[in-house]
Structure formats: structure tokens, C-alpha cells
């Protein structure tokens, strides 16, 4: 029995305690610091950001990435976030966007009406104007006219996005 206890202590990786102590914010922050330093050594002028997701915000019972915008704001030039508004949840999606307001400009760098109607997406864009400095969406290299001619669902979705995008944020 004593040999078994000793063996289990020996086989337990020592790094587990270190990882448990460091996760998640310190590792995320150090990674961003190192990347920023490396970029700045070759390019002192380009803006630096990290793509954040809705689960970058700490919330009860929700997966958490460790890339907390409040912690990381000092390391980046602007906040960029991937947000896909969901049907009947536009208010919650705007509230999520508000969570990224940490004193830096916000760019919604990845968005698309993937999980909501065109009308809900337009509403999301309209209401996000008070928080976002810009928006970037998908473009797969096909024009609006090409997408309209196609009979593929993906092209219909892309056409809807391109129509909204070309009109501008309502």
C-alpha cells in the first residue's frame, strides 16, 4: 500500500499545479504580451488586436476562454469581437457587445446573419452602432449578382448579407 501511494505521487505530473494556478487570464495576457512585443519589433505602427468571442466574458455557468477584455485592454490597440446575433436574442447580443466596452474602440470583426433573420441582423447592426466603431463580415469572393443567380442556400444567405452591407448600417 505504501508503495502504491508513493507511485501515484510520483506519476502525478508536477505541472498540473502550475497550470491550475496560472489559468486562464495570466496565460492569455502573457501570450498577448509576447505576441505584441514580437510584432512591435518588426512593425511599430500597425494596430494590434486579438479576436475575442462571446465567451471571453466571465459569466456564471458559461464556458470561459480566459481572454477577458478588461484584463487584455492594456495590451491591444482595439477590441475585436466575433458576434453572431441569434434569433429572438438581439437584446442579449447587444448586452454581450456592451461587455466588451473597456475603453478601447470595438470592431465587430466577424458577424453574419447565420443564426437570425435578416431583420434581426439589421436591428443588431443598428443597435450596435453606439458601441462598435466598425464591422467586418464574411465575403467569399462572389458578387451580389452572382449570389442572386445561384440556387444554393449558402449563396442566398450571402446575398442577404451583401444587400445589408451595401446599403450600410441602417
What kind of region is each of these model predictions?
Residues 143-170:
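Extended, alpha-helix-rich binding/interface surfaces that flank or overlap catalytic cores
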Residues 2-142, 147, 157:
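Extracellular glycoside hydrolase catalytic/binding regions
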Amino acid at each position: 500500500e505504501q508503495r502504491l501511494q508513493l507511485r501515484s505521487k510520483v506519476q502525478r505530473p508536477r505541472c498540473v499545479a502550475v497550470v491550475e494556478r496560472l489559468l486562464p487570464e495570466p496565460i492569455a495576457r502573457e501570450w498577448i504580451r509576447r505576441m505584441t512585443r514580437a510584432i512591435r519589433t518588426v512593425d511599430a505602427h500597425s494596430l494590434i488586436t486579438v479576436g475575442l468571442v462571446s465567451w471571453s466574458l466571465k459569466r456564471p455557468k458559461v464556458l470561459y476562454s480566459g481572454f477577458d477584455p478588461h484584463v487584455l485592454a492594456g495590451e491591444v490597440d482595439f477590441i475585436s469581437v466575433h458576434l453572431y446575433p441569434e434569433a429572438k436574442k438581439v437584446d442579449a447580443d447587444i448586452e454581450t457587445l456592451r461587455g466588451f466596452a473597456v475603453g478601447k474602440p470595438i470592431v465587430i470583426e466577424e458577424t453574419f446573419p447565420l443564426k437570425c433573420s435578416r431583420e434581426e441582423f439589421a436591428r443588431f447592426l443598428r443597435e450596435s452602432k453606439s458601441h462598435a466603431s466598425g464591422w467586418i463580415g464574411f465575403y467569399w469572393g462572389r458578387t451580389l449578382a452572382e449570389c442572386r443567380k445561384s440556387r444554393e442556400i449558402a449563396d442566398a444567405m450571402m446575398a442577404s448579407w451583401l444587400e445589408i452591407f451595401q446599403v450600410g448600417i441602417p
